[in-house]
Curated annotation (Swiss-Prot):
This is Sigma-E factor regulatory protein RseB. The keyword tRNA-binding does not apply. Negatively modulates the activity of sigma-E (RpoE) by stabilizing RseA under non-stress conditions. Although not essential for association of sigma-E with Rsea it increases their affinity 2- to 3-fold. When bound to RseA it prevents proteolysis by DegS, which is probably relieved by lipopolysaccharide binding (LPS). Keywords: Periplasm, Signal. Disruption phenotype: Slight increase in basal sigma-E activity, retains acid stress induction of sigma-E.
Length: 318
């Protein structure tokens, strides 16, 4: 039954992209199949995660038990760091820290968020371009580029195993083609036995769910007049900033289904100034005007972050 469901899901994904003229049908269908395979198969990946901060060796195991996802991400070198997913709860185990659990749909740490993206949503704003085929981890792979049509975002190159549709390599590139991050599989296994081997995790006692205080919901007297196509507001909040004498900060979170960023506005202080910092995929851009400090934080090129900040419009308080 699991194999039948998986096969029918792949067919459905292909049908959608065959009828959608806004994306390369074949490449779009393959990417949607990668999304389905990553969340439905029982498999184990040994991979390296390469960023500007260094290289990590990790193992990721995924299975579906009783219709629920069960996954484990384990750091293989140095101190033992582990992330466990059971259903919609993600538990973190770090040396020197009290274990805790958060709500979530999947493990994002060291895994490309692209893997879990709904490519049907991206189709109007991104091009999916077939680059050819090559071998990764001794597997023949389809190579596909994921590029925003308006040129305001980073891009991806995906190497996907032709048989299982699992990702074997994912590169995140900036607008100049420089690699910001790389996910690269060294070895992998697809087997129903992996689910059996993870039974202990299914029964393990996990740390309690961490209560995350929600921000105060209120209407803001500001909003961006421009964001890249496809981005929409996901949430907004108003909360005190402990590091700045509980100065209230207002935030709006935006996402296009692949990348995300937040717009944060607080009253300017004597220490506020214009500044820009980029670390890997993450940009922090701050500007000061109209007695307010505007900070853009997210997975955006610096030029795009600046354009969003410059577009902020303030309205008179009623």
């Amino acid at each position: 039954m699991k194999q039948l469901w998986f096969a029918m899901s792949l067919v459905a994904a292909s049908l959608f992209f065959s009828a959608n003229a806004s994306a390369d049908p074949a490449s779009g269908a393959l990417l949607q199949q990668m999304n389905i395979a990553s969340q439905s198969l029982n498999y184990e990946l040994s991979f390296v995660s390469i960023t500007k901060q260094g290289v990590e060796s990790l193992r990721y195991r995924h299975a579906r038990l009783d219709g629920r996802p069960l996954a484990q991400l384990l750091q293989l070198d140095g101190p033992r760091r582990e992330v466990v997913q059971r259903g919609n709860e993600i538990s973190y185990f770090e040396p020197g820290l009290e274990p805790f659990t958060l709500n979530g749909d999947y493990i994002v740490d060291s895994l490309p968020s692209l893997i879990y993206t709904d490519f049907k949503r991206l189709a109007p704003y991104y091009d999916f371009i077939s680059v050819g085929r090559t071998r990764i981890a001794d597997r023949l792979c389809e190579v596909i580029r994921v590029v925003a049509r308006d040129g305001t975002r980073y891009s991806y190159i995906v190497w996907m195993d032709m048989d299982t549709k699992l990702p074997m390599r994912v590169d995140l590139l900036d607008r100049d083609g420089e690699t910001l991050e790389q996910f690269r599989v060294i070895a992998f296994t697809v087997s129903q036995d992996i689910g059996s081997n993870m039974q202990a995790l299914a029964k393990a006692n996990l740390p309690p769910l961490l209560s995350v205080p929600g921000g105060e919901k209120t209407k803001f007297n500001w909003s961006p007049s421009w964001v890249p196509q496809g981005f929409s507001e996901v949430s907004s909040s108003r909360r005190p900033l402990p590091t700045m004498d509980n100065l209230p900060i207002e935030s709006r979170l935006y996402s296009d289904g692949l990348f995300s960023f937040s717009v944060n506005v607080n009253r300017a202080t004597q220490n506020s100034s214009d500044q820009m910092l980029r670390t890997g995929r993450r940009t922090v851009y701050s500007s000061v005007r109209d007695n307010a400090e505007i900070t853009i934080v997210g997975e955006l090129p610096p030029q795009t972050a600046k354009r969003i900040a410059d577009s902020i419009k303030f309205r008179a308080v009623q």
